[in-house]
């Protein structure tokens, strides 16, 4: 399939190509090449990341334009994942964290996204779906506390100083290897298939950190766990639009 994935400056304000007024310093003038690509190409889906104070109209302007030129397109919004910046006061150490903290943060994010998606669903039935990366990351936190991620040494490098952490900073950028989990969640949602069914070796690039150099890749065991977590997150989130009633790893 052919997919339109927004770069971060477009994610910050999804309707930026339709508005000439700058609202953030990161935004340049509208990029007509994106509208041209949509209007002249054949596309299957558009994907976004969320941002603060999102509104349905920020997305509907894109959806309307896309459906005008590609009526069969579907639309996907990643729900990102919990961030320590949501906590007030911020944690002083990982002793202040536990699974329940992340479950609570995830539910707070879900509530906001649910309202947004339901509003869009009323206008575009069965067209808008959530990519539940947040749910998957909470499941990863659960696996960590259960001792199922022995290669991972902490929850957040910002608190622990450990290189191999689930997150690497207060904002919530992923730790080494967890981009695979994010990718598997995207795959599972869009293709409605469990990543466990992916055959053969995936030629992942090695992780090179600007300060730390080449980092260890996730083991095959950790990679397989990521695939299972991704599918579990997707089929258990009703906003993903993916069901697996017979549990064969193929969306119904």
Please state what every model-predicted region is.
Residues 65-76:
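A short helix->loop->beta-strand "cap" motif at the edges of active sites that frequently abuts
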Residues 83-110, 114, 139:
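Serine-dependent acyl-ester chemistry module
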Residues 28-32, 55-62, 99-117:
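Well-ordered, non-membrane alpha-helical segments in soluble/globular domains
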Residues 1-65:
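Conserved SGNH/GDSL esterase-like catalytic core that processes O-acyl groups on lipids
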Residues 2-5, 50-56, 80-85, 135-139, ...:
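Solvent-exposed loop/turn segments at secondary-structure junctions
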Residues 44-49, 74-79, 129-132:
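Structural recognition of the beta-strand scaffold that forms the well-ordered cores
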Residues 111-164, 183-194:
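Extracellular serine-dependent O-acyl
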Residues 154-252:
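Conserved catalytic region of serine esterases and O-acyltransferases that act on ester linkages
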